[in-house]
């Protein structure tokens, strides 16, 4: 039986997955991890993990508002992340 990953190890793995090669996306995802991840409910965490699986070019267009995200849950979290102060 696999052990559940402790929160610190999970955060380190997520931080690595948040490295997108685009500074702006790195900062947006990092901001979420630093400010919201620890208190986020499981459903919101699942949505964030879905975002991490998306392609960078799509994420860029969604975060910059050039294109609407087709998934309502993802779009809501993107809006929340964009609204976080720098």
Swiss-Prot record:
Any one annotated GO CC term: cytoplasm
GO BP, sorted A to Z: succinate metabolic process
Alphabetical list of Pfam families matching this protein: Sdh5
InterPro entries per the UniProt record, alphabetical: SDH, SDH_sf, SdhE_FAD_assembly_factor
SUPFAM superfamilies xref list: YgfY-like
Localization annotation: Cytoplasm
Main subcellular location: cytoplasm
Keywords per UniProt: Chaperone, Cytoplasm
Similarity comment: Belongs to the SdhE FAD assembly factor family.
Known function: An FAD assembly protein, which accelerates covalent attachment of the cofactor into other proteins. Plays an essential role in the assembly of succinate dehydrogenase (SDH, respiratory complex II), an enzyme complex that is a component of both the tricarboxylic acid cycle and the electron transport chain, and which couples the oxidation of succinate to fumarate with the reduction of ubiquinone (coenzyme Q) to ubiquinol. Required for flavinylation (covalent attachment of FAD) of the flavoprotein subunit SdhA of SDH and other flavinylated proteins as well.
Protein name: FAD assembly factor SdhE
Organism: Xanthomonas campestris pv. campestris (strain ATCC 33913 / DSM 3586 / NCPPB 528 / LMG 568 / P 25)
Name of the gene encoding the protein in the UniProt record: sdhE
